[in-house]
């Protein structure tokens, strides 16, 4: 009950001169956001709010590699599980490697004055970023995956 009483004076405060000067940006932004949805398409504004709730859920579920890490783990060691903390570390590791490879491939494309990153740039960036034997295995697996993809 008390919050409702506080909300009513808050609605009156923008009408007053002094609080309006202090809280005009905050009070101004909230009605604008509320006006944008109903003003856009009347009843569909309510559906727009539902879409926003859907978008919020979409924002919460950030794309991760967790499913794929788990699938690979089960292929290699079917009887072993993984903790959520270890999964988070693995996900961060893959994101880090991905960023390094993407940055290196972008540099290579820029050096060669090419607008497109091709499999050649990716392969070269793998050789530059990953050390020794790991790079060789990654290149062979990548080549195998690309040929499988193109033949399918």
From Swiss-Prot:
The modification N6-acetyllysine is found at residues 7, 35. Disulfide bonds: none annotated. It is found in: Nucleus; Chromosome. The keyword Transmembrane helix does not apply. GO terms for cellular component: nucleosome; nucleus. Can be acetylated to form H2BK6ac and H2BK33ac. Monoubiquitinated by BRE1 to form H2BK143ub1 and deubiquitinated by UBP26. Required for heterochromatic histone H3 di- and trimethylation at H3K4me. May give a specific tag for epigenetic transcriptional activation. InterPro entries: Histone-fold, Histone_H2A/H2B/H3, Histone_H2B, HISTONE_H2B_site. CDD domains: HFD_H2B. Its main location: nucleus. Residues 1-59 are annotated as: Disordered. Residues 1-16, 34-52 have a biased composition (Basic and acidic residues). There is a cross-link at residue 148 (Glycyl lysine isopeptide (Lys-Gly) (interchain with G-Cter in ubiquitin)). It holds the Pfam family Histone. GO terms for molecular function: DNA binding; protein heterodimerization activity; structural constituent of chromatin. Keywords: Acetylation, Chromosome, DNA-binding, Isopeptide bond, Nucleosome core, Nucleus, Ubl conjugation. Belongs to the histone H2B family. Core component of nucleosome. Nucleosomes wrap and compact DNA into chromatin, limiting DNA accessibility to the cellular machineries which require DNA as a template. Histones thereby play a central role in transcription regulation, DNA repair, DNA replication and chromosomal stability. DNA accessibility is regulated via a complex set of post-translational modifications of histones, also called histone code, and nucleosome remodeling. The nucleosome is a histone octamer containing two molecules each of H2A, H2B, H3 and H4 assembled in one H3-H4 heterotetramer and two H2A-H2B heterodimers. The octamer wraps approximately 147 bp of DNA. This is Histone H2B.9. It comes from Oryza sativa subsp. indica (Rice). The gene is H2B.9.
